[in-house]
């Protein structure tokens, strides 16, 4: 077995990663099984690990339906690699996206961890289902994709809700659903430390996709117009389509923040962890919206000196294959332009989306009174093993490790 590659950033952080995590998720010692009842001890463990990971559903659109984008053998090899790598790092909490099909695939993750002697619980929410009438009766049988949260024993896990963020009419659940367009959800779960009986809200989400790198391309268009290299009127439809995608994500974030605030006010929660595939980049309007709401990027909190790119088409061959796709909305927006100009726009789009970027995040909201000392490390998860040319997904996961002893991060 080859070594898992991790690109890491380590930094002492004496103020910021919280008694929230030590008090909530810390559990004294690593016990192999979940105990239903225990006397609270209040004893923290010195190390806590949190993972957000887009696992890749392996599907692609095909007319009015979807089809597998990879062979069964390739998919199984990817999953085996994921299971092997997850069993090595053994995260205390996992926030997963693009898990398909549900609920069966969530059970496969649990079973894979159990084979390594690890006991996990899971909750899930379907966010893409097509039309499903009953168990085993669906217009698109292979589609029941969605979000999962897993917690390692002895942590306790409870689903709070599957919050629909956007998509209008329609809903997806385990065995029944109706979907005519893209639906987006946030899976909100409660994680409890039985040793302290304290709780934290965790959220796994996958925001609207649409155009990739909206803010990046809008800025490039403005620069070209200002420099006299392009006419504003030629890009009106493109900018409008990009801004529409951006606004949809902003509305998804606002709805989520409103719900978090409501739950946070009602429940005995010490904090909130939000992780997932956000489909935006640092300093985009959506990122700033989360910051204004009091959610802090755990990576930025470490004051790193280098970037960690969770979507890197140059290094990740699966992500590289995805850059060949051009959104239908982009083709529609440029259809009235001369063919030569269309070609230049498409070439510019391809150059932009082949660049490495950070679109997967872990955000944290905490009590202002929190004064924990300690440090944390943020790393990529799921890079190719030495014996494998391909990673487990088109995204790398984001692994956050908190250590109560700040000297361990030096």
Where on the chain are the PLM-derived regions?
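Active-site beta-strand/loop signature of hydrolases that rely on acidic residues for catalysis
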Residues: 49-55, 82-107, 150, 189, ...
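Bacterial N-terminal signal peptides
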Residues: 17-27
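Acidic/histidine-rich helix-loop elements
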Residues: 52-78, 170-179, 208-248
């Amino acid at each position: 077995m080859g070594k898992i590659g991790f690109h890491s950033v380590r930094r002492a952080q004496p103020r910021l990663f919280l008694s929230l995590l030590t008090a909530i998720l810390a559990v004294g010692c690593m016990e192999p099984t979940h105990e239903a009842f225990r006397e609270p001890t209040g004893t923290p463990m010195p190390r806590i690990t949190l993972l957000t990971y887009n696992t890749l559903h392996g599907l692609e659109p095909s007319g009015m339906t979807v089809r597998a984008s990879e062979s069964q053998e390739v998919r199984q090899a990817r999953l085996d690699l994921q299971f092997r790598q997850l069993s090595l790092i053994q995260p205390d909490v996992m926030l997963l996206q693009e898990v398909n099909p549900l609920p069966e695939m969530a059970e496969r993750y649990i079973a894979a961890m159990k084979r390594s002697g690890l006991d996990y619980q899971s909750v899930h929410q379907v966010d893409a289902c097509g039309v499903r009438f009953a168990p085993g009766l669906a217009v698109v049988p292979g589609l029941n994709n969605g979000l999962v949260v897993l917690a390692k024993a002895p942590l306790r896990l409870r689903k709070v809700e599957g919050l629909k963020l956007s998509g209008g009419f329609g809903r997806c659940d385990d065995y029944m659903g109706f979907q005519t367009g893209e639906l987006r959800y946030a899976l909100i779960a409660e994680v409890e430390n039985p040793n302290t009986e304290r709780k934290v809200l965790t959220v796994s989400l996958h925001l609207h996709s649409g155009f990739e790198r909206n803010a990046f391309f809008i800025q490039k268009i403005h620069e070209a117009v200002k420099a006299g290299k392009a006419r504003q009127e030629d890009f009106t439809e493109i900018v409008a389509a990009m801004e529409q995608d951006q606004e949809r994500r902003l509305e998804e974030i606002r709805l989520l923040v409103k719900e978090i605030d409501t739950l946070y006010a009602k429940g005995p929660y010490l904090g909130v962890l939000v992780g997932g595939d956000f489909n935006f980049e640092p300093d985009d309007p959506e990122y700033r919206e989360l910051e204004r709401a009091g959610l802090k990027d755990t990576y930025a909190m470490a004051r790193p000196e280098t970037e960690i790119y969770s979507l890197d088409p140059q290094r990740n061959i699966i992500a590289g294959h995805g850059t060949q796709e051009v959104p239908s909305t982009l083709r529609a927006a440029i259809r009235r332009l001369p063919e030569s100009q269309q070609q230049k726009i498409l070439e510019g789009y391809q150059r932009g989306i082949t660049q490495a970027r950070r679109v997967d995040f872990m955000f944290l909201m905490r009590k202002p009174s929190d004064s924990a000392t300690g440090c944390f490390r943020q790393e990529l998860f799921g890079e190719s093993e030495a014996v494998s040319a391909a990673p487990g997904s088109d995204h790398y996961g984001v692994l956050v490790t908190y250590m109560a002893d700040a000297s361990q991060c030096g």
